[in-house]
Amino acid sequence: MVQGCTSNAGKSYLCAALCRMLSDEGLRVAPFKAQNMSNNAGVTPPESSAPGLEMGRAQLVQARAARVVPDVRMNPVLLKPEADTSSQVVLLGRAAPELTALPWRERKPRLWPFVKGALHSLLDEFDVVVIEGAGSPAEVNLRPSDIVNMRVAREARAAVLLAADIDRGGAFAHLLGTWHCLMPEERALMRGFILNRFRGDASLLAPAPEWLEEQTGVPTLGVVPWLNVALPEEDGVAVEAPAAIIPSPSTGFVAIPRLPRVSNLDEFAPLGELARWVTSPQELAGARAVILPGSKSTAADLAWLRATGLAGAVTRLAVQGVPVLGICGGLQMLGQTLSDPQGVEGGSAASGGKVYGLGLLDLHTAFAADKTTRLSEVRDPETGLRLQGYEIHHGQTRSGPGVQTLVPGLLWRSGNVRGTYLHGLLENSAYLEHFLRWADLPVPACLDSLDARLDAIAAQVQAGLSWDRVRALL
């Protein structure tokens, strides 16, 4: 099990690497994370025993690394933030409104049996289960209701590796402090420390790892280098400094408004340094294209766009001929009207009245209680490309006479403005190339596939670990 001293310590990357490394040895491997809090979700594929169900993108990627079919048991609980103090609960791939309505501390006793059941079924079915923790196990206030860190480790009798992000500084204090906050029976499960995202000469770390082992009895089992390889992100922590897989051009970029309730932001990782997250009209200067991303609270984020002046600025760019792409919630914002007669979003449109969109596409969206979750593969008649992606939305959208429907219910166009419900478009390398050419941006000579990136990450992580000692923990 990989735990971290903090959020964004690199747990997801390390787990993906371990899944690929162990799969390379011929073992049947499954990833597992009891609970994710993220709006970066995907859906299980048709070959899954239960297709079309939601789970965290990190575990979807880890399943790919392990070369197994994704299964919602790998991420039994998914919390999708809707506001500062509320989250939608997705249990075993399906929205659970009865749990969403409960206070946080009352949910946990009801969730644990599902977590425990999913964990043990995977342990029975696979040779190895690579478990990812969440945040930090040292949050003393969360210990009584823990269902994702040390309670899972105890249940699985897992060997725990604790990772710290050394690039941020204070890694040895983080590791020692986390260890001190654990209960004695939890410390007994701690089998190694990992210094993650290191840049420079590892010999300069001496004698700190030896000192740390003297203090705790826990050895440092790896110094993993900074990995400049992009994987889909679990949450929004890394938005401020996205990993790059495409060189930054001297001029021009793709502007993406940093909506307060942005969802599925991981799908923009293929843009690398070409992506620039913006929060003001001034930051749009020089943009070659604009993408309006998905949102968990579309009407509220549309109001934010207007309050910041970005709505008007994006509209002006569209009128000037700059390519604009809206994805899911972004598609809905580009339309004429949004209505929420059932109060599905619980926000600005909850009264059932209409909210007016940017009017760049002649589309009208009504939110419905039933959620669409499915993988889709369609042919784009405009480009001739086969597009693969996934849908996760409550909106039902109808078109007016002023928009061209490219794929019914999925893809629309009006001049230089396009909208789609299909997440993951840019993860299709052929479409990414088309998009970059459309935006008059440079197309790199080679776009690495996800499997190639997973292989690269696994090789670098294995080189940084004392792999024989880690492997012996199984």
UniProtKB/Swiss-Prot annotation:
**Assigned keywords, A-Z:** Cobalamin biosynthesis, Glutamine amidotransferase, Plasmid
- Please give the positions of the paired cysteines in each disulfide bond: none
A GO term for molecular function: ABC-type vitamin B12 transporter activity
Instruction: Read off the PROSITE patterns from this record.
Output: GATASE_COBBQ
Against Pfam families, the record matches this protein to:
CbiA, GATase_3
Active site per UniProt: C328, H423
Q: In which pathway does it act?
A: Cofactor biosynthesis; adenosylcobalamin biosynthesis
User: Residue ranges of the GATase cobBQ-type domain?
Assistant: 251-431
Give coiled-coil spans as residue ranges: none
- What's an example Gene Ontology biological process for this entry? cobalamin biosynthetic process
Q: What does this protein do?
A: Catalyzes amidations at positions B, D, E, and G on adenosylcobyrinic A,C-diamide. NH(2) groups are provided by glutamine, and one molecule of ATP is hydrogenolyzed for each amidation.
Describe the family membership recorded for this protein in Swiss-Prot or TrEMBL.
Belongs to the CobB/CobQ family. CobQ subfamily.
Q: What name does UniProt use for this protein?
A: Cobyric acid synthase
Phylogenetic lineage = Bacteria, Thermotogati, Deinococcota, Deinococci, Deinococcales
Q: Which gene encodes it?
A: cobQ
